[in-house]
């Protein structure tokens, strides 16, 4: 993770009582049981914004929600609607299937919005293809789910891409990380 991004997270988290940073995982591809895959969440005015989604991301978010003993209603997993991916390394992406499927099972009705580099859209397509029998079962089975909450609206991050809403402004930059292009994000 780009240190500049982490420092900006801390600046944002201290700028307002209504903005908080949750460090969900700082792990590497190595299976350390004490560290989940790379993932951070900024909660701005009770709207969650997820950055990278390594292994265990949904369980870590759920731990902060009242359903699982936490204090942040906004972090019920079905409330995750925005996810940003900096680059396609396994320690940043292995939680993608869980991010798509579990919040939908828990009641998310709106499609998840993912902003990521080239290749991330194909990852989503392959996950949906792999889980299609389960999705069909959940839509048409004995306990039907909605037919929209597992969908994803994907936007490819390009240099100087800007996402902005009433709570947050995010800009994508370009750099090389271990010989791979990456999109560090400033907030």
Where are these regions (language model features)?
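Extracytoplasmic
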Residues: 35-37, 109, 149
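Short glycine/serine/proline-enriched coil/turn segments at secondary-structure junctions
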Residues: 30-32, 106, 179
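Single conserved hydrophobic/aromatic residue that forms the stacking wall/gate
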Residues: 176-187
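Non-globular, low-confidence helical/coil segments that flank catalytic cores
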Residues: 21-23, 111-115, 123-126
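Zn-dependent metallo-beta-lactamase
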Residues: 10-50, 57, 161-173
């Amino acid at each position: 993770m780009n240190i500049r991004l982490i420092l900006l997270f801390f600046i944002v988290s201290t700028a307002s009582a209504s903005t908080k940073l949750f460090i969900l995982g700082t792990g590497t591809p190595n299976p350390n049981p004490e560290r989940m895959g790379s993932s951070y969440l900024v909660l701005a005015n009770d709207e969650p914004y997820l950055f990278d989604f390594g292994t265990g991301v949904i369980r870590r978010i759920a731990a902060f929600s009242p359903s699982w003993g936490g204090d942040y209603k906004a972090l019920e997993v079905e409330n995750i609607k925005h996810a940003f991916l900096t680059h396609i390394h396994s320690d940043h992406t292995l939680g993608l299937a869980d991010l798509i499927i579990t919040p939908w099972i828990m009641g998310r009705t709106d499609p998840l919005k993912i902003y990521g580099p080239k290749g991330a859209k194909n990852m989503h397509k392959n996950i949906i293809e792999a889980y299609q029998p389960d999705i069909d079962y959940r839509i048409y089975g004995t306990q039907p789910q909605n037919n929209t909450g597992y969908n994803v609206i994907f936007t490819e991050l390009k240099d100087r891409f800007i996402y902005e809403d009433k709570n947050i402004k995010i800009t994508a930059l370009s750099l090389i990380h271990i010989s791979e292009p990456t999109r560090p994000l400033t907030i």
